[in-house]
Curated annotation (Swiss-Prot):
Lineage: superkingdom: Bacteria
Protein name, as recorded: Glucose-1-phosphate adenylyltransferase
Similarity field: Belongs to the bacterial/plant glucose-1-phosphate adenylyltransferase family.
Organism: Rhodopseudomonas palustris (strain BisA53)
Keyword annotations: ATP-binding, Carbohydrate metabolism, Glycogen biosynthesis, Glycogen metabolism, Nucleotide-binding, Nucleotidyltransferase, Transferase
Gene Ontology MF annotations: ATP binding; glucose-1-phosphate adenylyltransferase activity
Pathway, per record: Glycan biosynthesis; glycogen biosynthesis
Length: 420
């Protein structure tokens, strides 16, 4: 247990971000990039939220473990997160899987992804490790979680939030006592246990953990020597500590950064095309629950140099117009109408098109007289003149990746296969 350290505890912590997952439920969006590198919110990547939370919380030592198709992610981190200065006792390390302790090319699990880099962590000598998943959308002050960890004398503190039971099978689910000490922890149960006072809800792990570094090292070395372990935090490390030590739950409501005092806490997994589309479209609300305009808690990212967005033509039937939409730098909207749409960097929309509730990634070009509704369009796609999506479900399903909720994911290979 920690003694003799005064707050803020973040200055004694290192954030370790697990960013190696593919995110296969995002389908073709992760064919060329890891899930943490997927674009979000007009100009950011998903990983920028965990990294920005760490930076805004006061953490100045950060490491990112990468694995699946890491080139896009590494390039983004090198360009957008290169401002840490060793002379100010700051560091930012990118840690690809690299056979550091064995002949295995890949990390064997989330715990192994930390274990293989113990020597790098040890060289910085942090008092605490804040272990983060790099693939969630939320704003959170990790200093408050660190404070609870120290105050309650925990071996591990687990970030958690309430989710509907029917959705809890994809999470670690816990049961806690009146002091939020974790009594049981089950990773991704087929039948998630309910909260005692809320039969339709479960208390789920956010994949955020706080450890004292020395204790974490001991646990990782013990786990690495266990041939029966899958070397995973949720499956192995956390249940072992619950049984043999003191594990405490930190409720997200205590540390979330809200868009305004009355707003609900906002955390999204964005692990499916439907969830990804919905979380982006959330940002088009007049007062969204996730505030990207908060100067006190900014989302840092790579600031690509682009010209301003431009809207041209102002004639009846040919007017460049965007309503309840986010339009990034370098975009040109030429005589077309957008509603509840996100345009990422460098998108070009030609005349007479109508676009509604669309998430359009960088450098897409939309031809003339297109009608696009409820779509996600991958980076660099060229949409041909006259394409209609969102009107005929059967035709959409034949041509594109159409989800249960009717969202169409469009990639360039899908466009190339069209018989137009």
């Amino acid at each position: 247990m920690t003694t003799g350290i005064e707050p803020p505890f973040a200055r004694h912590a290192m954030a370790y971000v697990l960013a190696g997952g593919r995110g296969s439920r995002l389908m073709e969006l992760t064919d060329r990039r890891a899930k943490p590198a997927v674009y979000f919110g007009g100009k950011s990547r998903i990983i920028d939220f965990a990294l920005s939370n760490a930076l805004n919380s006061g953490i100045r030592r950060i490491a990112v473990a990468t694995q699946y198709k890491a080139h896009s992610l590494i390039r983004h981190l090198q360009h957008g997160w290169n401002f840490f200065r060793p002379e100010r006792n700051e560091s930012f390390d990118i840690l690809p899987a690299s056979q550091r302790v064995s002949e295995e090319l890949w990390y064997l699990g989330t715990a192994d992804a930390v274990y293989q880099n113990l020597d790098i962590i040890e060289s910085y000598d942090p008092q605490f490790i804040v272990l983060l998943a790099g693939d969630h959308i939320y704003k959170m002050d990790y200093e408050k979680m660190l404070q609870q960890h120290v105050q309650q004398g925990a071996h591990v503190t687990v970030g958690c939030l309430e989710v509907p039971r029917k959705e809890a099978s994809g999470f670690g689910v816990m049961h806690v006592d009146a002091n939020d000490q974790i009594l049981s922890f089950i990773e991704k149960p087929a039948h998630p246990p309910a909260m005692p006072d809320k039969p339709d809800m479960a208390l789920a792990s956010m994949g955020i953990y706080v450890f004292e570094t020395k204790f974490l090292f001991e646990e990782l070395r013990r786990d690495a020597a266990d041939k029966n372990s899958s070397h995973d935090f949720g499956k192995d490390i956390i249940p072992h500590i619950v049984k043999h030590g003191k594990a405490v739950a930190h409720r997200f409501d205590r540390s979330c950064i809200r868009s305004h005092a009355e707003s609900a806490s906002y955390w999204r997994d964005v692990g499916t095309v439907d969830a990804y589309w919905a979380a982006n479209i959330d940002l088009t609300d007049i007062v969204p629950q996730l505030d990207l305009y908060d100067h006190n808690w900014p989302i840092w990212t790579y600031g690509e140099i682009t010209p301003p967005a431009k809207f041209v033509h102002d004639k009846v039937g040919r007017r460049g117009l965007a309503t309840s939409s986010l339009v990034s730098g370098g975009c040109i909207i030429s005589g077309s109408t957008l509603t509840q749409t996100l345009l990422f960097t460098g998108v070009r929309i030609h005349s007479f098109s109508t676009i509604e509730q669309a998430v359009i990634l960088p450098y897409v070009e939309v031809g003339r007289a297109c009608e696009l509704k409820n779509v996600v369009i991958d980076r660099g796609v060229r949409i041909p003149d006259g394409l209609v999506v969102g009107e005929d479900p059967e035709l959409d399903e034949q041509r594109f990746r159409r989800t249960e909720n009717g969202i169409c994911l469009i990639t360039q290979p899908m466009i190339d296969r069209l018989d137009l």
